[in-house]
Amino acid sequence: MARHQAVSQLHFFALILESLFKGADHPLSHFHNVSEDELDELWSWNTPLQPELRFCMHEKVSERAALHPEKIAIDAWDGTLTYGQIEDYSDKLAKLLRLLDDSSNRIIPVLFEKSRWTSVAVLAIMKSGACFALLDPAQPEGRLRAVVQQVNAKIFLSSKAQSTLAARVAPAATIIPISKSKFNKIFSPYTAEQPNTTLPPVSPDQPLYIQFTSGSTGVPKGCILTHSQYTSGAIPRAAAVGYYPHSRVLDFASYAFDVCIDSMLCTLAHGATLCTPSDERRMNDMSGAMRDMQVTFAGMTPSVARTLEVDILNNLESIALGGEGVSISDAMSWGQRTRVVNAYGPSEATVGATINDNVAAKPYITMGKRKGCALWLSDPENHNKLVPVGAVGELLIEGPIVGNGYLNNPSKTKEVFIEDPEFLLKGSKSYPGRHGRIYKTGDLVRFDPDGDGEPIFVGRQDQQVKLRGQRIELAEIEFNMQKHLPPDTQLAAEVIKPSGGGEQTLVAFLVEQKKNGMRHLDGNVFGSFTNKFQDALRDMTKQLFVDLPSYMIPSAYIPLWKMPLLVSCKTDRKRLREIGASVTRQDLRRFNSAVSEKKEATTEMELKLQSLWAKLLGGDADFSANDNFFSMGGDSLRAMRLVAAARDEGVVLSVPDIMLNPTLSSMAEKAKPVSAEETSDVPPFSMIAKDWDVDAARQESARLCGVDVANVEDVYPCTPLQEGLIALSAKFQDAYVAQRVATLPAETAVRLKEAFDTAVQGSPILRTRIINVSGRGLFQVVLKDGQLVREYSTEVSEYLRLDRNEPMDLGTALFRYGLVEEPGSDKMNFVITMHHAVYDGWSMPLVFDRVNRAFNGLHTERPSSFKHFIKHLISLDPADAQQYWKERLEGTIPHQFPPLPQKGYTTQADSLLEHYVTVPTSAHSKLTLATIIRGAWALVSSLYMGHPDIVFGETLTGRSAPVPGIEQIEGPMITTVPIRVRLSLDRPIAEYLQKIHAQTVKQIPHEHLGLQNIRRLSKDARVACDLRTGLVLHPKEDEDWGTVDIRNPANTFLPANDAEGAREALKFNTYALMLVCTLEENGFLVMASFDSNCISKEAMERVLAVLDRIVHAFLGNPESKLGDVAVLDPVEAQDAEAMRPRDVMSDSALGMSPVDGPESMDASLKELSPNEEKLRSILGRILGMKETDIRPSDSFFDLGGDSIGAMRLVSDARAQGLNLTVAQVFQSSSLSDLAASASNEREDKLAEILSRILGMAKTDIKSSDSFFELGGDSIGAMRLVSDARAQGLNITVAQVFQSKSLAELASSAEEETPSQPRVDTDAPFIALGKDANLHSPDRVGLYLENQGWEITNIYPTRPLQQLAVEGTVDLPRYSLRYELIKFATPIDRQRLEQACQELVARNEVLRTVFVKDDGLTLGVVLSSLVVPYTETAVPDGEDADAFIQAGIKQDIEAPKPYGSSFVAFNLFTHTNGASTLVFRISHAQYDEICLPILFEQLSALYAGTTVPETVPFSKHINHVVLDNIPKAIPYWKNLLSGSEMTVLKPSIPLTHRGPADIYKEFDISRRPANITIGSLPTAAWALVLSRRLSRTDVVFGEVVSGRNVGAPNADRIFGPTWQYIPFRVAFSKSWSYLDLLRYVQDQHMTSAAYESMGFSEIVKNCTHWDPESVQWFDTVVHQAPAWVEEMPFGNGVEAKFQTLYPHAEPLREWKCQAFVKDGGRKLGIEIVTFEEWIGEAEGVLEEVGKALECLMEGRAGESIF
């Protein structure tokens, strides 16, 4: 016993004794009163009362938004929102709500699934001054409708997904669906009508929300809470619970419970992040969702908390529990892992009246301390009578958190909300009384015996109970049961705890006919139900599932002989609970069997689930096969547990599976064993043939991709879809390639590139290439480094044009991205280009989501990748699918819509029409819009073709395959299947549509067989797969795409040339007619792409009108017969008559079938020759057909054959003595035609290749044959091109497709002659050319510091590189740079040294030393090099910076001879744990572009993460010397013809020649459109020179990157590619300033391709300038790149960078350096010149500023002269 309790009881004992001494005539009740001392103690606990907080919670949220607008406020499964966004969106929506209804006391229901938009809706209602009522769409419609009727809703906010439900439950209200598109449409700045209202201040006394709870009359009761009431509790409560700005708070609670309001408002008011998982993950994978969202704080019931995995608890800062009691064992267990908080609070007094902020602190559980209130305990029968301390009493809550009462229910309000109770007015001896309002909770509690005043929960007083966290009014259940049972039935709902263990269970006790008393004569309290009553119970149960939530449905109906009653004639509930405690779980199931038919569990899965049910629900495993999980005590929580338990037993279930299939038998049918794909990963190279060695696969793949072998990560087969797409794109080059563009602020674009880099590393499909492996076919190769990025400083339209012309084919990247400046603005265009072979419409949003999450620093992992899907396809047994499609397509009629103009016609879509079909919002159908469209189109086709058997193709998502996480796999899975519909005009429309829906579901397991495989199954399948119409049901473009969201920039990508993704899909049309239907909320947009030779534009317009009419008829009259709407008007009928083939009877009704003409009959009866008999037998075996289905007139292609089957046919035929070739098979109209051989040398080469590819003899190929006549296809065309190039013939796939004959193809080929040998630009020593022998490794090796070094390459240095080498070798060594990498925290020194040496090993230029041989400076690449690495301790007391700089000075003065390494590292360590790595490097080895990559590599090497790849500098040298310079010489000759160097030399003599500089920033925010920033300083400098020197032709220098010369992966070249090149401006007298800018920009773009030539090379080879007098530029313009100042260095180490150039480069010229500032709105100009000329420089800088002003908008159109 606690000391306080002992003292209290002694005082109480003394008080009793004292009273007894005074007189013994006191009633016993007198001693139940609280003593004066105890009353004083109670008042001390409750004084002072917290004052009311007079502000609104949304004001706090607004303050947070103003402070941190860019911070993530909501991180939800459906997207993120920043504080700035929720503030903006809620403001706009609030104004709209005011415009719609500004009356007082408005109550607005809110109906959302878990979503980021819920908080926006709630805040908007708060700001508008209205009151919200949160609803959960999972609740029954009857309950939702009862709530809505009470609030008399005129406006209803819902999500788009719940808008239909909202309309049903509130038919009189205005439904406002909330989504991103809602804000875009209504609040767009381009919308004519804008909400024009202001938001009035909201009084704290106004109602904030209404919380509906279970009602005793059967109707939910709504408790009203004002702003101040909520805030008065929320603010102190949040502080105790643990909401902080860094918190990531789980949004778990259902919207039906008020805890969710705290989750939203407390989180946002404290600047934290609300993490909202989807409802599916919330129920099925809570631990996974919390892990992915990095949740730090979660609130839930203890029952749910028990399902969390251990690592989740370990990573939580706090977990708040409420809704039900917390066991001490749970509290102690969880308290060892995280801080456990317990909350209590009835809805009538806000969410939490008490908070125990450390549950594990005591060996028992208290309700915690008061928050915003006072707590009193009274006699349950008399609220004015307080009970003594330690006694059990009803909990009363007083204070500013007590609500206003119940909506429209004054009697109930008066019953439990008490104004000025007597005990409160009276006070105590030490505390004066006060006025106040209390709420009677009905909860029985007592105060903690340790004297701190904390209450301890004991039980409930009334019929309101809590079961597994859900608050239940038993009377509401009884009310709803009684409605459906005979009037003389007695019943009582109760929560019992059956004997034998297990959790509490809701049951109903029933007496079939009213009887009073207790026992039957035999002493048994239990009765029985008649058959008629059992039927009534079954019907009632069905209705309960409609009217009540599942947790309010009794788990069992217990029959009683009589209902136990109290003396007061009330039901004796205590006795009922005693009876309930005497029954077992088996008894409950036995009672239930009385109202359900018993069926034994028999199957293996039923028995397994039966055992799992027993573990979860208690008792023995004797469940019936038709027992209902929820009737047996299950609920949503147990469903979650069952999912996890089943997974542990190797069974796959989901919560929806359980919800939709609650009986044991139906659940067992839905359950399936865990597949191998779900339990194992797919190792690299595990899906290639066993006879293909992994090393050989790597080498072959690397060769075909043109990459290093080490870059190959995996190889596996292509899907049939990928094979077809990559092949067809070779025929139509840009048809299957999409470009998308996002225009973004420059800084955001650069960050987005980094996010893409991260996303690409995590998404193998983006790094995938497709190759053709000789003899094996097509494979996809995943590279470690996809080499996908490029940057251009050009106009975006030009970039798109060039990018479109860069093919995506075999061996090349199928996904790439680039940055393009937006001329005249601070924006950049981010362009992505992607081939359909690596994406589809489903997967691209997943890629963008991955990019957005990377952009925001969130996790990007996904459970599965494309290779898991490939493994699934490989594992499939096609027999089931073959049987399904064979039966499904049996008897298909060949004549389909639209008909072809003639047999063999190749369709080519050339026309496009759009038609919008409006679907009335009042039209409700149980079937999806997709099913209605399928059915309507089948009827349209039938009307036009005149028969009832319709086939068309539909492209599906393909994501119904049983691959775990398939919905999150990035990659193309779309598949096309033939949809066959047979119409019966006498059937009802609803039945017809239901049949189509059922067919769609049935085909799901078979949809990946592939059209090419389906068409081989039979003659009918071939007919069916000759598809004329393709249907794509395209979901509306993600509402977030195309909108500027700085937190999710990947959502802003739009198709480069088309406004919508649906239109983009039309580019992929290979049908006579393709219908892309974009499904929207109120209808669908049909885009029809068609061949006008098959159907005219006018006729197609009428077809779409018929489709529109039929859709409306289906929706309006679903019970009508199909024939009632199968009507064409006269003009439409005339169109149909003209389209129908002659062999379809024109006067037939839809029941008629086509007949074969006499020709086909004769052919089928023709006697077969012996050879034809042999061929038919072989074909039947190869194609899996009956021989009787094969006629002599059939061609192999018509029978469904392909190139592989053709080779099998040739092989088998030759074995039987038939001399057949693949060419004969494909070319002929029958199977016996022959072909002749080709002629001439080129044709002979091609014929030889074709014979190998097509498996035919050369002699069977003639020059007049076309590739496709010979049996070639798109895949074969790519193989032909690849093999031809290997034979020295350069042809393209386009040429293969365009050539009508082999002769034409041969004549178009470019043959590489011996005089034009193919050059391997990667070969070592090749850049030395004819001097390679002179500068041999043996000779050059003599110059090396260590003659034991192994030389792998030698190249001539570039001009600037040579100067840098001299500036390193010779004093003062101005080309040496020292990079200081400063670590503030301790670093692993050994690991750092290893990272530095590995850095050198990875980068060729770092292990390059420089020598001078015969006057030529050479770069000598070593196979390996250990560079100097030293450690130096900074002495105690020394200034670290000064000590390090002294060390650098000493180092730079030491000799750096030719032949030695210029690279060195020195780690300076400090006694405080900090350190500084000094990295020495020469400008001969780097430029400013590549150095940041070096530091990224060093960081990755230290951290052990993926290291960015770089391109060796020698590759750049080879490309420049062998390829670029020869092309550049003519360009520079032409540009500089007749020019001379412009000289700007003041008359001031130079004496000291020291450098000086002057700097100023200029506003360029008004630069003209389509002009790059880089054009401005160049144009301005040209103007200054022209005006200062009175010249119209000026030449000066520019510093360029040297990386735009066409070399692959130029941005990853590691080495000094930079160059000084000449820039010439020959002014025209007619120019405006804008003309000058365009001229400069054009020269920039043109010169970029030739910028690799050095200045001395240009002077020598391209000008008539005197090399002696013109040794350098007089003036140079330089736009400085950005530099990294700090970056993470791995393992939590942060690095800061400082650069030291101990000696400045000698000044040779005027420098005009430009720096982009303020996001491109300003340009900093620095003029560097000699000290003596600095005064002159001030004037020059002023003139530059004036020139820039002339180049801005407003003056750019003025004439220069």
UniProtKB/Swiss-Prot annotation:
One Gene Ontology term from the biological process aspect of the record: amino acid activation for nonribosomal peptide biosynthetic process
One GO molecular-function entry: phosphopantetheine binding
Region described as Condensation 2: 1354-1677
Name of the protein in question: Nonribosomal peptide synthetase 6
Ranges where the record places region Condensation 1: 712-1135
Coiled-coil intervals, chain numbering: none
Protein species of origin: Cochliobolus heterostrophus (strain C4 / ATCC 48331 / race T)
Deletion phenotype: Leads to increased sensitivity to oxidative stress and to iron depletion. Reduces the virulence toward maize plantst. Causes a defect in colonization in planta, but not in prepenetration growth or in penetration.
Pathway assigned to this chain's UniProt record: Siderophore biosynthesis
Assigned EC number: 6.3.2.-
Classification via PROSITE patterns: AMP_BINDING (PS00455), CARRIER (PS50075), PHOSPHOPANTETHEINE (PS00012)
Modified residues (O-(pantetheine 4'-phosphoryl)serine): S636, S1203, S1274
Family: Belongs to the NRP synthetase family.
GO cellular component, one term: cytoplasm
Gene it is expressed from: NPS6
Region (Adenylation): 63-468
Function: Nonribosomal peptide synthetase; part of the gene cluster that mediates the biosynthesis of hydroxamate-containing siderophores that play a critical role in virulence. Cochliobolus heterostrophus produces extracellular coprogen-type siderophores including coprogen, neocoprogen I and neocoprogen II, as well as the intracellular siderophore ferricrocin. The role of extracellular siderophores is to supply iron to the fungus during plant infection, and the intracellular ferricrocin is required for intracellular iron distribution and storage with a crucial role in ascus and ascospore development.
Carrier domain ranges (all copies): 600-675, 1169-1242, 1237-1313
